[in-house]
Amino acid sequence: MTAIGAQAYKLLGPKRPHRSFFESFIRTLIIVCTALAVVLSSVSICDGHWLLVEDRLFGLWYFCTISNHSEPHCLRDLSQAQVPGVAVGMGLARSVAAMAVVAAIFGLELLIVSQVCEDVRSRSKWAIGSYLLLVAFILSSGGLLTFIILLKNQITLMGFTLMFWCEFTASFLFFLNATSGLHINSLTRSPPAGTLAYRKQGYDGTSLI
């Protein structure tokens, strides 16, 4: 390609979309909050201790009993908790919650790539990433609801541990970032190519400029 041809391609080829400072700030804030939600959810699931009821500690991975002057005695066999269906149900809850983190990580990656490598597909990547965050919210909420339903007879509001509230906060952030990402993508949608040309002409075909 000659120098003139290369210059013409730069002038006529697709240009990177220009974004305002406010839009860039909002998109960066969504990415940062999503990363925070991924960290909160990951820590919460790895720890897994979500409910403390008197001397019993219920979690995704362990069931623990606590005495006054000794360390917690934890068992991997969740059936020892003597709660119907808790062994199978906790397996489902932690699997769904872990899948939520995976979906959120992929969504976060697409959000970052759409901002770092801006091209004509950046908006599509951002939209897909936002939808993945919505999937992460649904899965994370499913894990929380499964845990609550399994232990509905033992639950007290003050019994929920910090790790449970971390997962709850992460689930809320997944939803907030997903809806915010889709909303800002729709607000900043560029008009079709023919729209601007149509606006420059009158109804009789004469140019307005």
UniProtKB/Swiss-Prot annotation:
Q: Where is this gene product found?
A: Membrane
GO molecular function: any one? voltage-gated monoatomic ion channel activity
**Where exactly are the transmembrane stretches of this chain?**
25-45, 96-116, 131-151, 155-175
Q: Which of UniProt's keywords are assigned here?
A: Calcium, Calcium channel, Calcium transport, Ion channel, Ion transport, Membrane, Transmembrane, Transmembrane helix, Transport, Voltage-gated channel
* Membrane topology of this protein: Multi-pass membrane protein
This protein's GO CC annotations: monoatomic ion channel complex
Name by which UniProt lists this protein? Voltage-dependent calcium channel gamma-like subunit
Per the UniProt record, the source organism is Rattus norvegicus (Rat)
